[in-house]
Protein backbone atom coordinates (compact mmCIF):
# COMPACT_ATOMS: atom_id res chain seq x y z
CA UNK A 1 0.00 0.00 0.00
CA UNK A 2 3.02 2.31 -0.13
CA UNK A 3 1.90 3.68 -3.50
CA UNK A 4 -1.66 4.45 -2.36
CA UNK A 5 -0.79 7.29 0.02
CA UNK A 6 0.94 10.65 -0.49
CA UNK A 7 4.67 10.09 0.25
CA UNK A 8 5.03 13.49 1.94
CA UNK A 9 1.82 13.38 3.96
CA UNK A 10 2.52 10.02 5.59
CA UNK A 11 6.01 11.22 6.66
CA UNK A 12 4.93 14.49 8.29
CA UNK A 13 6.37 14.68 11.78
CA UNK A 14 8.69 11.74 11.10
CA UNK A 15 11.20 12.94 8.50
CA UNK A 16 9.18 15.70 6.79
CA UNK A 17 8.40 19.16 8.23
CA UNK A 18 5.16 21.05 7.75
CA UNK A 19 4.95 23.88 5.19
CA UNK A 20 2.86 25.96 7.61
CA UNK A 21 3.75 26.15 11.29
CA UNK A 22 1.25 28.18 13.29
CA UNK A 23 -1.54 27.72 15.81
CA UNK A 24 -4.81 29.66 15.93
CA UNK A 25 -8.07 29.86 17.83
CA UNK A 26 -11.18 28.33 16.32
CA UNK A 27 -12.54 31.68 15.14
CA UNK A 28 -9.22 32.65 13.49
CA UNK A 29 -8.24 29.34 11.92
CA UNK A 30 -10.33 29.68 8.74
CA UNK A 31 -9.08 33.21 8.04
CA UNK A 32 -5.45 32.16 8.53
CA UNK A 33 -5.88 29.15 6.27
CA UNK A 34 -7.51 31.26 3.57
CA UNK A 35 -4.71 33.82 3.91
CA UNK A 36 -2.07 31.10 3.54
CA UNK A 37 -3.74 29.82 0.37
CA UNK A 38 -3.90 33.30 -1.18
CA UNK A 39 -0.28 34.06 -0.26
CA UNK A 40 0.95 30.81 -1.82
CA UNK A 41 -1.17 31.39 -4.92
CA UNK A 42 0.19 34.94 -5.31
CA UNK A 43 3.85 33.97 -4.80
CA UNK A 44 3.61 30.98 -7.14
CA UNK A 45 2.21 33.22 -9.88
CA UNK A 46 4.67 36.07 -9.32
CA UNK A 47 7.76 33.83 -9.08
CA UNK A 48 7.14 31.51 -12.02
CA UNK A 49 10.65 32.13 -13.39
CA UNK A 50 12.43 31.93 -10.02
CA UNK A 51 12.60 28.09 -9.76
CA UNK A 52 10.37 27.97 -6.67
CA UNK A 53 10.71 24.86 -4.50
CA UNK A 54 8.80 25.43 -1.22
CA UNK A 55 6.95 28.19 0.60
CA UNK A 56 7.00 27.92 4.40
CA UNK A 57 4.62 30.16 6.36
CA UNK A 58 4.87 31.04 10.05
CA UNK A 59 2.63 33.38 12.06
CA UNK A 60 4.43 34.70 15.16
CA UNK A 61 2.58 37.32 17.30
CA UNK A 62 0.05 38.76 14.83
CA UNK A 63 2.48 38.87 11.93
CA UNK A 64 3.43 36.57 9.08
CA UNK A 65 6.86 35.24 8.14
CA UNK A 66 7.27 33.66 4.70
CA UNK A 67 10.37 31.65 3.78
CA UNK A 68 10.81 31.15 0.04
CA UNK A 69 13.02 28.22 -1.00
CA UNK A 70 14.33 28.92 -4.49
CA UNK A 71 17.19 27.91 -6.75
CA UNK A 72 17.46 31.48 -8.12
CA UNK A 73 17.45 33.86 -5.14
CA UNK A 74 18.70 36.75 -7.27
CA UNK A 75 15.49 36.72 -9.31
CA UNK A 76 13.40 36.93 -6.13
CA UNK A 77 15.47 39.67 -4.48
CA UNK A 78 15.90 41.87 -7.56
CA UNK A 79 18.18 44.89 -7.89
CA UNK A 80 19.04 46.27 -4.44
CA UNK A 81 16.20 44.26 -2.93
CA UNK A 82 13.45 46.14 -4.78
CA UNK A 83 11.51 43.04 -5.86
CA UNK A 84 11.52 41.39 -2.44
CA UNK A 85 10.26 44.63 -0.88
CA UNK A 86 7.34 44.68 -3.33
CA UNK A 87 6.59 41.06 -2.44
CA UNK A 88 6.67 41.90 1.27
CA UNK A 89 4.19 44.74 0.82
CA UNK A 90 1.87 42.57 -1.29
CA UNK A 91 1.97 39.69 1.21
CA UNK A 92 1.24 42.08 4.08
CA UNK A 93 -1.77 43.44 2.18
CA UNK A 94 -3.11 39.94 1.43
CA UNK A 95 -2.59 38.63 4.98
CA UNK A 96 -3.68 41.85 6.69
CA UNK A 97 -0.73 41.75 9.13
CA UNK A 98 2.94 42.88 8.99
CA UNK A 99 4.98 40.55 6.79
CA UNK A 100 8.58 39.39 6.68
CA UNK A 101 10.14 37.65 3.65
CA UNK A 102 13.13 35.30 3.99
CA UNK A 103 14.96 33.74 1.06
CA UNK A 104 16.55 30.28 1.28
CA UNK A 105 18.70 29.05 -1.59
CA UNK A 106 18.35 25.50 -2.91
CA UNK A 107 21.96 24.42 -3.46
CA UNK A 108 21.26 21.32 -5.58
CA UNK A 109 18.15 21.82 -7.72
CA UNK A 110 18.75 18.44 -9.39
CA UNK A 111 17.89 16.78 -6.04
CA UNK A 112 14.74 18.81 -5.37
CA UNK A 113 11.59 16.99 -6.46
CA UNK A 114 9.56 20.10 -7.27
CA UNK A 115 12.33 21.71 -9.31
CA UNK A 116 12.94 18.47 -11.23
CA UNK A 117 9.23 18.11 -12.02
CA UNK A 118 8.95 21.75 -13.14
CA UNK A 119 12.08 21.36 -15.28
CA UNK A 120 10.61 18.34 -17.07
CA UNK A 121 7.33 20.21 -17.57
CA UNK A 122 9.08 23.20 -19.14
CA UNK A 123 11.04 20.90 -21.47
CA UNK A 124 7.85 19.15 -22.60
CA UNK A 125 6.25 22.53 -23.31
CA UNK A 126 9.29 23.33 -25.50
CA UNK A 127 8.61 20.09 -27.44
CA UNK A 128 11.58 18.14 -26.08
CA UNK A 129 11.02 14.37 -26.36
CA UNK A 130 9.58 13.11 -23.07
CA UNK A 131 11.96 10.12 -22.84
CA UNK A 132 14.98 12.39 -23.26
CA UNK A 133 13.72 14.78 -20.57
CA UNK A 134 13.02 11.92 -18.14
CA UNK A 135 16.39 10.22 -18.65
CA UNK A 136 18.25 13.51 -18.30
CA UNK A 137 16.55 14.22 -14.97
CA UNK A 138 17.31 10.70 -13.69
CA UNK A 139 20.98 10.88 -14.72
CA UNK A 140 21.51 14.33 -13.16
CA UNK A 141 19.95 13.27 -9.84
CA UNK A 142 22.00 10.08 -9.58
CA UNK A 143 25.18 11.93 -10.56
CA UNK A 144 24.70 14.39 -7.68
CA UNK A 145 24.25 11.71 -5.02
CA UNK A 146 20.62 10.60 -4.99
CA UNK A 147 20.09 7.06 -3.67
CA UNK A 148 17.27 6.53 -6.14
CA UNK A 149 14.80 8.37 -8.36
CA UNK A 150 11.59 7.57 -10.18
CA UNK A 151 10.01 9.81 -12.81
CA UNK A 152 6.57 9.22 -14.31
CA UNK A 153 4.75 11.12 -17.05
CA UNK A 154 1.19 10.56 -18.19
CA UNK A 155 -1.02 11.95 -20.93
CA UNK A 156 -0.98 12.11 -24.72
CA UNK A 157 2.73 11.38 -24.93
CA UNK A 158 4.23 12.28 -28.28
CA UNK A 159 0.82 13.42 -29.51
CA UNK A 160 -0.67 9.91 -29.34
CA UNK A 161 -4.46 9.70 -29.56
CA UNK A 162 -4.69 7.36 -26.56
CA UNK A 163 -3.25 8.66 -23.30
CA UNK A 164 -0.80 6.46 -21.40
CA UNK A 165 1.84 6.74 -18.70
CA UNK A 166 5.52 5.82 -18.75
CA UNK A 167 8.11 5.87 -15.99
CA UNK A 168 11.83 5.42 -15.41
CA UNK A 169 13.49 4.42 -12.18
CA UNK A 170 17.09 4.11 -11.08
CA UNK A 171 18.35 3.08 -7.66
CA UNK A 172 16.01 2.48 -4.68
CA UNK A 173 12.73 4.26 -3.93
CA UNK A 174 11.39 2.53 -0.75
CA UNK A 175 7.89 4.01 -0.37
CA UNK A 176 7.01 1.66 2.53
CA UNK A 177 9.94 2.82 4.70
CA UNK A 178 8.75 5.77 6.79
CA UNK A 179 12.29 6.82 7.78
CA UNK A 180 13.22 7.09 4.09
CA UNK A 181 13.75 10.71 3.04
CA UNK A 182 11.69 10.75 -0.17
CA UNK A 183 11.04 14.04 -1.92
CA UNK A 184 7.80 13.70 -3.90
CA UNK A 185 6.45 16.41 -6.21
CA UNK A 186 4.10 16.85 -9.14
CA UNK A 187 3.81 19.27 -12.02
CA UNK A 188 1.92 19.60 -15.30
CA UNK A 189 2.93 20.58 -18.82
CA UNK A 190 0.40 22.31 -21.09
CA UNK A 191 1.17 21.13 -24.63
CA UNK A 192 -0.73 21.53 -27.89
CA UNK A 193 -2.08 17.98 -27.44
CA UNK A 194 -3.32 18.54 -23.90
CA UNK A 195 -2.03 18.43 -20.34
CA UNK A 196 0.77 16.00 -19.41
CA UNK A 197 1.21 15.19 -15.73
CA UNK A 198 4.64 14.66 -14.17
CA UNK A 199 5.41 12.88 -10.90
CA UNK A 200 8.86 12.69 -9.31
CA UNK A 201 10.11 10.62 -6.36
CA UNK A 202 13.70 11.24 -5.15
CA UNK A 203 15.19 9.02 -2.42
CA UNK A 204 17.99 10.85 -0.57
CA UNK A 205 18.75 8.32 2.17
CA UNK A 206 17.31 7.09 5.47
CA UNK A 207 16.83 9.29 8.55
CA UNK A 208 16.70 7.70 12.00
CA UNK A 209 16.36 9.81 15.15
CA UNK A 210 17.15 13.02 13.30
CA UNK A 211 20.42 11.74 11.85
CA UNK A 212 21.41 9.51 8.91
CA UNK A 213 20.86 5.82 9.62
CA UNK A 214 24.54 5.06 9.05
CA UNK A 215 25.54 7.30 11.99
CA UNK A 216 22.74 6.26 14.35
CA UNK A 217 23.72 4.54 17.61
CA UNK A 218 21.57 1.72 18.99
CA UNK A 219 20.02 2.41 22.43
CA UNK A 220 21.78 0.76 25.37
CA UNK A 221 18.66 -0.09 27.38
CA UNK A 222 18.06 -3.87 27.29
CA UNK A 223 15.55 -4.29 30.14
CA UNK A 224 12.37 -3.83 28.07
CA UNK A 225 13.62 -6.43 25.57
CA UNK A 226 14.25 -8.98 28.34
CA UNK A 227 10.77 -8.42 29.76
CA UNK A 228 9.13 -8.98 26.40
CA UNK A 229 11.10 -12.15 25.83
CA UNK A 230 10.06 -13.41 29.27
CA UNK A 231 6.38 -13.01 28.43
CA UNK A 232 6.77 -15.21 25.39
UniProtKB/Swiss-Prot annotation:
Cellular component GO terms held in the UniProt record: cytosolic small ribosomal subunit
Q: For this chain's UniProt record, which GO biological process terms are given?
A: translation
Record's PANTHER family?
A: 30S/40S RIBOSOMAL PROTEIN S3, SMALL RIBOSOMAL SUBUNIT PROTEIN US3C
Where does the record locate the signal sequence feature?
none
Q: Which UniProt keywords apply?
A: Ribonucleoprotein, Ribosomal protein, RNA-binding, rRNA-binding
What this chain does, per the entry, is described as: Binds the lower part of the 30S subunit head. Binds mRNA in the 70S ribosome, positioning it for translation.
Q: Which HAMAP family match?
A: Ribosomal_uS3_B (MF_01309_B)
Q: Which family does it belong to?
A: Belongs to the universal ribosomal protein uS3 family.
Q: Which top-level group of life is the source organism from?
A: Bacteria
Which Gene3D superfamilies does this chain map to? 3.30.300.20, Ribosomal protein S3, C-terminal domain (3.30.1140.32)
Tell me the GO molecular function terms: mRNA binding; rRNA binding; structural constituent of ribosome
Record text on subunit structure and interactions: Part of the 30S ribosomal subunit. Forms a tight complex with proteins S10 and S14.
- Name the SMART domains for this protein: KH
Task: Return the SUPFAM superfamilies for the record.
Answer: Prokaryotic type KH domain (KH-domain type II) (SSF54814), Ribosomal protein S3 C-terminal domain (SSF54821)
- Organism, as annotated: Vibrio atlanticus (strain LGP32) (Vibrio splendidus (strain Mel32))
InterPro entries of this UniProt entry?
KH_dom, KH_dom-like_a/b, KH_dom_type_2, KH_sf_prok-type, Ribosomal_S3_C_sf, Ribosomal_uS3_bac-typ, Ribosomal_uS3_C, Ribosomal_uS3_CS
Its name, as the record gives it, is: Small ribosomal subunit protein uS3
Reply yes or no: does the keyword rRNA-binding apply: yes
Amino acid sequence: MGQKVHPNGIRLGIVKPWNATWFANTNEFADNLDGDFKVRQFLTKELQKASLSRIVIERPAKSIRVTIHTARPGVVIGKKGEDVEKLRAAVAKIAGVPAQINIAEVRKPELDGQLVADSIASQLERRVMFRRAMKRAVQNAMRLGAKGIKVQVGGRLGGAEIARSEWYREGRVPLHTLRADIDYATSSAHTQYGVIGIKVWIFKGEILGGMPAANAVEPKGDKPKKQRKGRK
